[in-house]
Amino acid sequence: MSSGGLLLLLALLTLWAELTPISGHDRPTFCNLAPESGRCRGHLRRIYYNPDSNKCEVFFYGGCGGNDNNFETRKKCRQTCGAPRKGRPT
């Protein structure tokens, strides 16, 4: 296969991965964890996946500790945990 063909295949696989919804069975287990502010006293606006509402929601992170259900953007939360897009910017 030519290098152009490989690049096309890679582009198609990347697009497919972005557009394929994540089911609850494919979702990382940390997506089901409750948000944890951690042990530090910062006040950082972060996003977590809420499995009860199937949405990425805001919480405030202290800056250290916590768990992996902690994202800087809604986009990253959606990509990782599969919440539907709400039509708002990240």
Curated annotation (Swiss-Prot):
Q: Which SMART domains match?
A: KU
Q: What is this protein called?
A: Kunitz-type serine protease inhibitor C5
State the protein's purpose.
Serine protease inhibitor that inhibits trypsin.
The BPTI/Kunitz inhibitor domain is annotated at 31-81
Propeptide residue interval(s):
85-90
**Tissue specificity note:** Expressed by the venom gland.
- Which InterPro entries does the UniProt record give? Kunitz_BPTI, Kunitz_BPTI_sf, Prtase_inh_Kunz-CS, TFPI/VKTCI-like
The text of the family note is: Belongs to the venom Kunitz-type family.
Keywords for the protein's UniProt record, in alphabetical order = Cleavage on pair of basic residues, Disulfide bond, Protease inhibitor, Secreted, Serine protease inhibitor, Signal
Gene3D superfamilies in the cross-refs: Pancreatic trypsin inhibitor Kunitz domain
- MF annotations from Gene Ontology: serine-type endopeptidase inhibitor activity
Question: Which Cys-Cys disulphide bridges does the record give?
Answer: C31-C81, C40-C64, C56-C77
**Localization:** Secreted
PROSITE patterns named among the record's database cross-references: BPTI_KUNITZ_1, BPTI_KUNITZ_2
The positions making up the signal sequence are 1-24
Residues at the site labelled Reactive bond for trypsin: R41, G42
Q: Which GO terms describe its cellular component?
A: extracellular region
Question: What sections of the protein cross the membrane?
Answer: none
